[in-house]
From Swiss-Prot:
This is Retinol dehydrogenase 11. InterPro entries: NAD(P)-bd_dom_sf (IPR036291), SDR_fam (IPR002347). Not glycosylated. Retinol dehydrogenase with a clear preference for NADP. Displays high activity towards 9-cis, 11-cis and all-trans-retinol, and to a lesser extent on 13-cis-retinol. Exhibits a low reductive activity towards unsaturated medium-chain aldehydes such as cis -6-nonenal and no activity toward nonanal or 4-hydroxy-nonenal. Has no dehydrogenase activity towards steroid. Its EC number is 1.1.1.300. It comes from Homo sapiens.
Length: 318
């Protein structure tokens, strides 16, 4: 009898998962930005805004009346997204600018152009990222994950920081991941030259996002600029394009994965919700403060990572 039941259960499993999917998805996609704040006259930059979570984040901010810059590597795709957002929201102040986070020259060029163009910056959302890339280096010789996900946004934030201070109250949102729990900052192997694993490299870079957020919050205390890191949830994303295994897993569990719109909610919560200033430096998931790993709470590592990052990017260490 048992021998007959097991094959039957295997046959029924896909059907049972399908039937349970709505409730499971509801459970996994909890957390909705409930803020009603409107943004007329506000200026926002969203990196990686031509797809996925970044696109949905930019769309909602445009819907609320902000002047939104889509900072993305693929300008042609960005222009198509900008037109889509303009049509959907009726907000024509959706602009596309070239930003390649794997090239510090591109980052500096973006910042220079933005600072010449705008008098204010109220929200910076560091959303762009890479995931599970085969070993490769940025234009400046950094390992791709740490180079794009951490160092690229570290430099961009520094270049725009004075504008954020001048525009205070203002906010910085860094998109991290639950994967940071598997991350470690190996200062002796920051560029992955001694040993490399694509999955772990992603985790390390997401840990770096949280450490950067916490150290930045300490340094910005009293400036009127607040900063938050977020875990968007497990989201349908182009980031898995480098891994056939992850693409297969995403397809297998597609019933349970958040949509990009759902994944954008925590970024929006941290960008918009009033009274969040006292929680600067915290990590959020599903629009609530979330627990982080022991290493992510290590102030000594955060300070050292700050100094090492400044040294790698040629920024003054203070």
């Amino acid at each position: 009898m048992v021998e007959l039941m097991f094959p039957l259960l295997l046959l029924l499993l896909p059907f049972l998962l399908y039937m349970a999917a709505p409730q499971i998805r509801k459970m996994l996609s909890s957390g909705v930005c409930t803020s009603t704040v409107q943004l007329p006259g506000k200026v926002v930059v969203v990196t990686g805004a031509n797809t996925g979570i970044g696109k949905e984040t930019a769309k909602e901010l445009a819907q609320r009346g902000a002047r939104v810059y889509l900072a993305c590597r693929d300008v042609e795709k960005g222009e198509l997204v900008a037109k889509e957002i303009q049509t959907t929201t009726g907000n024509q102040q959706v602009l596309v600018r070239k930003l390649d986070l794997s090239d510090t020259k591109s980052i500096r060029a973006f910042a220079k152009g933005f600072l010449a163009e705008e008098k204010h910056l109220h929200v910076l959302i560091n959303n762009a990222g890479v995931m599970m890339c085969p070993y490769s280096k940025t234009a400046d010789g950094f390992e791709m994950h740490i180079g794009v996900n951490h160092l690229g946004h570290f430099l961009l934030t520094h270049l725009l920081l004075e504008k954020l201070k001048e525009s205070a109250p203002s906010r910085i949102v860094n998109v991290s991941s639950l994967a940071h729990h598997l991350g470690r900052i190996h200062f002796h192997n920051l560029q992955g030259e001694k040993f490399y694993n694509a999955g772990l490299a992603y985790c390390h870079s997401k840990l770096a996002n949280i450490l950067f957020t916490q150290e930045l919050a300490r340094r910005l205390k009293g400036s009127g600029v607040t900063t938050y890191s977020v875990h968007p949830g497990t989201v349908q994303s182009e980031l898995v394009r480098h891994s056939s295994f992850m693409r297969w897993m995403w397809w297998l569990f597609s019933f349970f994965i958040k949509t990009p719109q759902q994944g954008a909610q925590t970024s929006l919560h941290c960008a918009l919700t009033e009274g969040l200033e006292i929680l600067s430096g915290n990590h959020f998931s599903d629009c609530h403060v979330a627990w982080v790993s022991a290493q992510a709470r290590n102030e000594t590592i955060a300070r050292r990572l700050w100094d090492v990052s400044c040294d790698l990017l040629g920024l003054p260490i203070d």
